[in-house]
Amino acid sequence: MGSLSPLSFLWGLLLLQGVLRPLRGDPVFIPPFIRMSSPEVRASLVGGSEDVTVSLTPLQIKEGVLPVPTCGGLRNETGDWNLTVSPQANMLEVTVRWKRGLDWCSPDETASFSEAPCIVQTLLVSASHNASCLAHLLIQVEIYPNTSVTHNASENMTVIPNQVYQPLGPCPCDLTAKACDIRCCCDQDCQPELRELFERFCFSGVFGGYVSPPSHHRCAARTTHQTPDWFPFLCVQSPPSTSPFLGHFYHGAISPRHSPGFETHSHLDLRDFFADASYKQGDPIMTTNGYFTIPQASLAGQCLQDAPVAFLRNFHSVCTTDLEVQERDRLIPEDMRIRTTGGLVTPTVTYEEATDLDKLITSPDTILSAGSAPRNVTVEEHYVFRWQNNSISSLDITIIRAEINAHQRGTMTQRFTVKFLSPNSGGEKEFSGNPGYQLGKPVRALHTDGMNVTTLHLWQPAGRGLCTSAALRPVLFGEDASSGCLLEVGIKENCTQLRENVLQRLDLLIQATHVARRGNSDYGDLSDGWLEVIRVDAPDAGADLPLSSANGMCPEVPTHVTIRILTAEAGAVEGEAQREILAVETRFSTVTWQYQCGLTCEEDKADLLPLSASVKFINIPAQMPRPTRFQINFTEYDCTRNELCWPQLLYPLTQYYQGEPRPQCVAKGLMLLSLLMLAILLRHPWVGMCKAWSSASIQH
């Protein structure tokens, strides 16, 4: 083994000293050794730092030997070095700073890199008490001129070449101007002698400067073991300047076109005359500018602003918008043209004003400012398409807008609906199938008193989720769903009135008395497949129940309604299964409501009572499942289908016989078997055979 240098030996002693001293509770520098390459370094003195003096001294190394450290007559100001001590929690933070800085290192701005360091020196930081040394910190200083960028940025304009013909940024790893970047072999600022130090560790790929590698399709490219089997069966003769990688790494952005305000849209593009489009169910609807899009809610709950609309797909979406975020600029409906068979369709747009914004806006805080003009926001958008065969004949758009303050805060609920109607459809009720129900279509319903009831409903909460602001949405066939809302109840609420109020809100969901058995049942003929809704009566709202007179507590409050719908498959039409409804039942669930108080019960503060509703579709098989191949081929062994049951031939000996104990049955069976064998042996053929064998043996 080679001998250790004095500097390495001293560093090892200081490191060992730094490891052992905290175990004894003595002061120690952490770390005990620092290799300094920047103008400033820091260390910490921990362990008994009270009444400790910290000082700095440069060490003069003679013939590779360090002098013995002493703690007498040391100063904080030592030549070009400055020592600062800052007390911290249970420690002292020691900062050593070089006064001259890096500006002194590079007086020549044209020099890109200097192989010789700017300063090489050894410093010793000592902690002492009453001239007695307690701890030492050894600092090895070696600072180069290009440790950091010291040059001013050039104000010259950089000419960016066209990347189609010349790679943009041929050396991406060249991050420092007028300085050599380590491991960047394409950096022109690196001297050959310096590049030799790291040329084996150069950055690879595009970051290392290989922005235009040679294509393996070129005949001049060298083949490797990783080339495909078909290469070089075909190759291309082309110069390196026409590399296919030019422009490959360019990802440009599309800048919007700003049209002048005086530009009119009365002119028609020649392409519009040939904009012919034929649709089938599920195809995206096209406009002259691209896809026809409407904000829609995704599966993750986010609102997609540019979701395409599919042909013959009705939908209803709800999006929540932050009022502080600027509303996106969308295409003006009047300027939109729908592509269809035979030309273009111009929509008919109707604007309406929204009322009662409190039901749509949550936390309606307004910051008033002088001279702030109101702004318009879109609350609802309704699109009605008229279609015939594979084309769109007309489009009616109804936009409901509201005027709010320019500094309105909170969130707003927006609704978007799309509906497709045939051209001969008028005010008649829309079918939900023909004849059976289609999945996702509303459940058809009616009221015998002639009320305008067409379906069952669930709540569609908005804003704060209160029942007073909740809208209604139809129950869709085959889709289990649940919804709810919050009802404000005071501490002095009358229980009878509370039950009546809750029952009234729950009855709004199921006002219908009959439900259509099929999707095309006639509303005018009650005998055309209409089923009466089976209702399980809710508790009497006016009944005198116990605890009903106590403030803040009401028993037997109906807060949940369950709608069970029995469905079945009733044949098929042209290979399509037809589903129908067999029965509908509604059932109420009650709870005991109690006012929830915090630290104190405030009489003027309302509590929130949650109301909920759920719908459940239960599928009942209309017929037995088709028998399998095993059931068809092996019915001869089925005792329930045949008069002769072979598996029960030895019934007393099988496990199905329970008349006697199992051991007794086995004993009787063995006895019966032995008697049977004896009877067979004593029969006439066996006796004749025995006599013949006996006579044959005598003759021999």
From Swiss-Prot:
Ranges that cross the membrane: 666-682
Q: Which GO terms describe its biological process?
A: cilium assembly; protein localization to ciliary transition zone; smoothened signaling pathway
Q: Which domain of life is it from?
A: Eukaryota
The record places the following residue ranges in the Cytoplasmic compartment, namely 683-700
Q: Which residues form the signal peptide?
A: 1-25
Membrane topology value? Single-pass type I membrane protein
Q: Residue ranges, Extracellular compartment?
A: 26-665
Q: Give a GO cellular-component term.
A: cytoplasm
Q: Where in the cell is it found?
A: Membrane; Cytoplasm, Cytoskeleton, Cilium basal body
Glycan-bearing residues: N76, N82, N146, N156, N389
Known InterPro entries for this protein? Tectonic, Tectonic_dom
Q: What keywords are assigned to this protein?
A: Cell projection, Cilium biogenesis/degradation, Cytoplasm, Cytoskeleton, Glycoprotein, Membrane, Signal, Transmembrane, Transmembrane helix
Entry function? Component of the tectonic-like complex, a complex localized at the transition zone of primary cilia and acting as a barrier that prevents diffusion of transmembrane proteins between the cilia and plasma membranes. Required for hedgehog signaling transduction.
Similarity-based family: Belongs to the tectonic family.
Assembly behavior = Part of the tectonic-like complex (also named B9 complex).
Question: Under what name is this protein listed?
Answer: Tectonic-2
Organism per entry? Rattus norvegicus
